[in-house]
Each structure stands twice: as structure tokens, then as C-alpha cells.
Amino acid sequence: MQKVAIVGRPNVGKSSLFNRLVGRREAVVADFPGVTRDAKEGLMLYHNHRIVLVDTGGLWSGDEWEQAIREKAEWAMEGAQAVIFVVDPREGLTAADYEVADWLRRLGKPVIVAANKIDSPKHDVYLAELWGLGFGDPVAISAEHARGLDDLMERVMAHLPADEEDVPEVAPIRISLIGRPNVGKSSLLNAITQSERAIVADQPGTTRDSLDVEWNYGGQRFVLVDTAGIRKKPDTAIEEYAIQRSEAAIERSDIIWLVVNATEIGDHELKLANLAYDSGKPVIVVVNKWDLVPDEALKQTEKELNQKLHHIAYAPRVYTSAINDYGIHDMLAEAMKLYEKWQSRIPTAELNRWLEIWQMRQAVPNFHGKPLKMYFMTQVETAPPTFAIFCNRADFVTRAYEGFLQNRIREDLGLAGIPVRLKWKEKGPYKKGKKGEEAEA
């Protein structure tokens, strides 16, 4: 597959161009320099060609992240057949632009200069200075207004090898890593991929954007999404927007890894568990930094986890140490098992045999001598498995009984570890004027 890297100094519009070419708002975009720190991959289609685009952090930023960002950019350049060098001619070339140009010449990749923020032909007067970069004729574009993008891609395609037309592929399993800042999400991602794809530091909030990384495990393709750490109260507008991007990444995911710090479990984990619960996606609780828990504190740590995460008690737990590579493969293996269950469908005949036996063996809610009667059960959706149960009185179903029933469905019907939804449909003389209720767990 063809690969193209997008580079440039901070705040020239690299992420805006990346988002425009990929076709959805993947990277955090704001008027603050240095918003993107990690190298982010996305897939674009151009005239039946699949191209991997890599959006890199702002180079020569002059801050504490400069060296780490440049190392990530150099990693992103490996395997790239061409480079889009984004500049802001309206602001004029800076010392950082020339530093980036010298760096690109040393790497020896084909370079196309994209003169961004040229919103109309009258701004073309700013282009003359760009010849001094030494990469030939620049392409005038506006990522914000989609101007000049075809011209840019034609120049890019001239440097790419011939590629076969797209062949339909099995969709990868998308997994989001969520957690509060500094619990080790990026370290886990790096441990899984055996590379330094995400910047890791002791300072909370290092990851500001949702970072997508493709990976293959056991013949299964994955897209691993390292999201920004979610705080109780965001400190800045950028953090607020990054949280929104994290929530959007969760919405597009198939599986959620809820990463918690084994040495520091608090009320914030409850909020994140609620977020995962509400998504209806399978959740794996990844208890990271497990190696730092003393033996005498193991039982207390488990007790705290049970208390904070009681409403997702069905979710499996994996105990990990990103530093020691402990439990890393278990995360992916468990995700594959849950994904298969999440997509499963149970025959109606099997469901109703189970329902009949259940009602014979187990007491049902009873109000004023009138018992709840469940007549029929069928699966109406997958991902997550959703079951409609036809009964005489939906209002007889208490929350406790419903949760109990959902747990038995998981255990008895091979759905352990995943969320299950129930829809109650009334049938019979009490149906008139009553509404079926829907529950989720």
C-alpha cells in the first residue's frame, strides 16, 4: 500500500489537510501551535488507489517535545514514497521552515511543497518565496476550503508506484483505549506494537488526540485508538476538544479497553466506566501497573475495583505491566473473543427452550398475586446482542430482576463478558396503554 507523510512546522495546517484528504475530522485542529504531537495514520481513497496518510507533529517547535516529535516524524517517514511539506506562505517562511527543508533533503524522499491557506488566486503572490526551499514549484492549496487538492494529489501520485485497485478486505476490529491521564495508555500501545508510536512521558496529558494505529495479531487486523486522557474538568479548550474526539473514537470502536492505574483507583474510574457502559460496546478492564501493587495490597485493590466498577462487573479484567510486557497479549486475545460474542446470533428455538426452563426453575416477580409471565423470546439485533421478551406486564420487571436475568443470559447462552440489552414487549390483555421498556447491561 502506498504511504505519504505530511510534515511541517507547527500551526501551518497539517492536520486540517490530513482531515480534508481522509474525509473526516480525525485530528485535533485549533489555532494553537503544537496541537498534534503524535504521528497519526489515516486511509484515503484517490482514483481507486488506497493511500496511507501520516499526519506528524509540528517540527522544530522549540519546546520540550521537539526531539520526541522529530523522532516520531522520522519513524513515520519510513516506508513513505512521498512527502507533503506544508507551509504557510501568508505568514512567510521562518527559520523552522528552513530547518524542516534541510532535514527533508537529508532524508532523500520526494517532496511536494503545499502552500496552505491560499484561499483565492489573489493570494498566489505569496508563492514566489517558496522556491527558495529548493523543492521546485509549490502547489497552492486551502485545506479549509478544499482548494487545489486535486492538483496536490496529482503531484503526489506522480511519485507513487503503481498499485493494484482496491480489493475488499475484512474490516479490522477497532479498539479504543480510554482512561484518565497518565494511566499508561500510550505505553500499552507501544508495548503491543513493539514500537514508540505514541509519545510517553510522566507528565499527564501527553496524548491530546486520538491516535489510530493498525496492527495484526493472530491473523486478525486491529485498529488501536489511543485516546486523550479524560479528566473530570478539562483545563483548556484543547483538552475539551480532545475529550470530544475521544468520545467520538469510542463511538466508532468495536471494543473498549478501560485502562486503570492499579496503584491509584478513584471516583474518576466510575465516570469512565459509565461512559463505556453507555456505549453498549464490550469493555475489557485493563488494570495497568499491576507490578507496582505490593502483595499485601492485592485484595484491597481488587475490592476497590469491584466497588468503582460494580455496574460493569460482567466485564473481564486483564492485569498488565506495559514496562514488563506482562499481560499484553491477553488484551488482544480477550478482545478477539469478545468481538465474536458481540456479533453472535442465537437461534430463536434455543432462546425459547432456555426461557421455558428458566421460568420452571426460577421464581419470577409477583405483584398482588399476579406473576410475571414471559411468553416468547427472540434476538432482534447483534452488536450488542439485543433480545425482545414478550410478557404480560412489563411494569412487573424490577431492575434487580432484570439485571439477574441478563447475568443468566450471559452465563447460560455463551455471552459472558459482553453487554446484553433487553426489550420488553407486552402481549395480552394488559398491552393497551402500556409501553414496553428497554434495558441495557
Curated annotation (Swiss-Prot):
Q: Does the keyword Transmembrane apply?
A: no
Q: Which residues does the annotation say bind GTP 2? A: 179-186, 226-230, 288-291
User: What highest taxon heads this organism's lineage?
Assistant: Bacteria
GO molecular function ontology, one term from the record: ribosome binding
Which Pfam families is this protein grouped with? KH_dom-like, MMR_HSR1
Q: Quick one: which residues bind GTP 1?
A: 8-15, 55-59, 116-119
Q: Where is the EngA-type G domain?
A: 2-164, 173-343
PROSITE patterns noted in UniProt: G_ENGA
In the record, biological process GO terms are: ribosome biogenesis
The family assignment reads: Belongs to the TRAFAC class TrmE-Era-EngA-EngB-Septin-like GTPase superfamily. EngA (Der) GTPase family.
- PANTHER family for the chain: GTPASE DER (PTHR43834:SF6)
Role this protein plays:
GTPase that plays an essential role in the late steps of ribosome biogenesis.
Subunit and interaction comment: Associates with the 50S ribosomal subunit.
The name of this protein is GTPase Der
Organism field: Deinococcus geothermalis (strain DSM 11300 / CIP 105573 / AG-3a)
Gene name, per UniProt, is: der
